[in-house]
A protein has these predicted regions:
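Pocket-lining segment of extracytoplasmic ligand-binding domains
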Residues: 69-70, 144, 150-222
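Short, glycine-/small- and polar/acidic-enriched structural segments
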Residues: 3-146, 155-158, 162-168, 178-186
């Protein structure tokens, strides 16, 4: 007969990141501190997707907020021991400008666009949208990559970057700090225009260690 006793409270170690993939953790962190969650959540803010990957691969983290493509690669590398648990971040990418007029994807032709997230979802999303609009990334549009979202935000504010692909919450930060920085394009809308019903632009997901879930299924489901 199933027990009605609640699952024992355990500590779940989570690797999150600055930017959209970690943004959804803020309320969880607060609720955990207040003691109002089913489990105790120990959230570490990793400096990059690679750092979060390292934490979940080594067992330092049980759960990691990762770019969706990174989670897919990790699933294959670990022979399925790191699995996708949930999608937690849909499209939050925007083209922002500082002193450039951009009203459509076509307006990016011949321009230099700055981005972060090389090798992650932003790169694949931008390349797909450009290609589907008849432009070859690197040929028709020059793309320069910054190390992280914070560096890119600083570049658009200083005017070093005139056009940038930036995620929330950094978009709100830069447009609030400088009214000359404008949101030119919503890349979720641009993705939908070319992909139709075939796919949805997802940015981030929660990946979990399979062995952790198997050992703590009740607590994880909570």
């Amino acid at each position: 007969e199933p027990s009605s006793t609640p699952a024992e409270k355990i500590t779940i170690n989570i690797a999150a990141q600055k930017g959209p993939t970690g943004l959804g953790m803020v309320k969880l962190m607060q609720d955990s501190e207040d003691g109002s969650t089913a489990n105790t959540y120990n959230v570490t803010i990793a400096s990059s997707p690679d750092a979060a990957v390292s934490m979940i691969s080594s067992g330092e983290a049980d759960v990691a907020a990762l770019p969706t493509n990174t989670a897919a690669i990790l699933y294959n590398k670990t022979s399925g021991n790191v699995q996708l648990a949930a999608l937690n971040t849909l499209g939050v990418l925007y083209v922002v400008t500082n002193g450039e007029e951009v009203n459509s994807i076509e307006d990016l032709r011949g321009k230099t666009v700055y981005s972060s997230g090389q090798g992650a979802t932003p790169e694949y999303a931008v390349n797909y949208i450009l290609s589907e609009n008849g432009m070859e990334p690197g040929t028709d549009v020059t793309i320069e990559y910054k190390a992280d979202h914070s560096e890119l935000a600083a570049s658009i504010l200083s005017g070093d970057a005139k056009i940038a692909v930036l995620p929330e919450p950094f978009v709100t930060q830069v447009t609030t700090k400088d009214p000359n920085v404008k949101v030119a394009l919503n890349l979720t809308d641009e993705w939908d225009k070319v992909a139709g019903d075939k796919s949805v632009l997802t940015m981030g997901c929660l990946a979990v260690r399979k062995d952790f879930v198997e050992q703590n299924k009740e607590a994880f489901d909570a």
